[in-house]
Amino acid sequence: MDGIRTSLDIEEYSDTEVQKNQVLTLEEWQDKWVNGNTAFHQEQGHRLLKKHLDTFLKGESGLRVFFPLCGKAVEMKWFADRGHSVVGVEISELGIREFFTEQNLSYSEEPVTEIPGTKIFKSSSGNISLYCCSIFDLPRTNIGKFDMIWDRGALVAINPGDRKCYADTMLSLLGKKFQYLLCVLSYDPTKHPGPPFYVPHAEIERLFGKICNIHCLEKVDAFEERHKSWGIDYLFEKLYLLTEK
């Protein structure tokens, strides 16, 4: 087996300092949508969520599920179709409109009075509500608590210097007996500046460990041909389950 890379061979970089000053503005994220630079979107949905979804839901209905930095994630419809209420936040209005169009869902839009210039887009069925604003403005809307958070492509997209504020925002939205599903990426951060940014286990412990039990459920090889252009030669994705201590 010499020369074959496995997930057990590669140690994590515990140091996140190399990327700490990396910044992408909200305008740059919006430009990615305008220019179609959205390789982060997964048209078929996330394989690990698909694998574990029914286990997480345990046959329950009527849960409130939050999608930070939701884009046009197809998983939002998965939850809605199972009888759950979905709330998302996304800075790109284009991304939100594309979600409803591509999922063949009729919707309405209205201003959010608490945040000038912000809109909320609601499915006609009433169980999907997407806010078009910065994640850091969202607490001003008093959107309540959630039973579950699906964080794929959110924490890894947040500027490293904003992670503590982001984590505190997420924790403020969690209700009792919550399940926080978190996907992060592991690669050599000295070879790629991000985003998506590198988030090691130690960083998750730092951000969430005081409030949450942290369990790594699965680690899979996520390296694709396109990742060679990042200058890296391995990429692993890890799915964590965070629960109430």
Curated annotation (Swiss-Prot):
Gene3D superfamilies: Vaccinia Virus protein VP39 (3.40.50.150). Its main location: cytoplasm. It comes from the Eukaryota. One of its GO terms (cellular component) is cytoplasm. Its EC number is 2.1.1.67. Keywords: Acetylation, Cytoplasm, Methyltransferase, Phosphoprotein, S-adenosyl-L-methionine, Transferase. The modification N6-acetyllysine is found at residue 58. The keyword S-adenosyl-L-methionine applies. It is found in: Cytoplasm. One of its GO terms (biological process) is methylation. Belongs to the class I-like SAM-binding methyltransferase superfamily. TPMT family. HAMAP family: Thiopur_methtran (MF_00812). Monomer. This is Thiopurine S-methyltransferase.
